[in-house]
């Protein structure tokens, strides 16, 4: 167990997977080393093979996928908003963006579209994509899908919004 007085050091520890404990009335933060990034359930990509670099792919757990992105992008500007969609399935969906890079009007529009869903359930990311498309008749893609966390991180750094859907890699 380590103690910090500087919140930036504590935030850096949190972003690397450590447990941070705040105690009311104490001017220090306790860091409990964990760094338990998930390894189970992470798959090799099927259709997006690369000759150099990692072939690590997303799993079917939104929590694992969020951790895979955070493992590569340890910036405090990386924001994550959780929403539950589906009256019966209560599917967890995460919206991730980089504060200061992403266009907030785009983020708010996607968030608004997701909150308007009146549906029994979302079973995979394909359903989510179809329901959030603005111009479904357009021949041009409005979404880019990937199986790879490194490509998702690259998209975040370009200012795009990343949607992660539970039960769907």
Language-model-derived ranges and their functions:
Residues 1-169:
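Cytosolic regulatory modules rich in charged/polar residues
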């Amino acid at each position: 167990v380590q103690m910090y007085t500087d919140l930036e050091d504590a935030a850096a520890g949190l972003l690397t997977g450590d447990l941070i404990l705040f105690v009311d009335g104490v001017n220090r933060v306790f860091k409990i080393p964990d760094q338990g990034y998930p390894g189970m359930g992470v798959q090799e990509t099927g259709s997006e093979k690369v000759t150099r670099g990692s072939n690590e792919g997303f799993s079917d757990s939104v929590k694992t996928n969020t951790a895979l992105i955070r493992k590569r992008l340890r910036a405090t500007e990386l924001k994550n908003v959780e929403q539950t969609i589906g009256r019966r399935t209560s599917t967890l969906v995460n919206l991730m963006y980089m504060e200061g890079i992403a266009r907030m009007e785009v983020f708010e529009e996607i968030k608004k579209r997701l909150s308007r869903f009146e549906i029994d359930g979302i079973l995979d990311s394909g359903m989510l994509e179809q329901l959030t498309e603005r111009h479904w008749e357009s021949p041009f893609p409005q979404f880019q899908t990937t199986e790879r966390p490194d490509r998702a991180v690259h998209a975040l750094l370009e200012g795009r919004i990343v949607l992660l859907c539970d039960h769907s890699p």
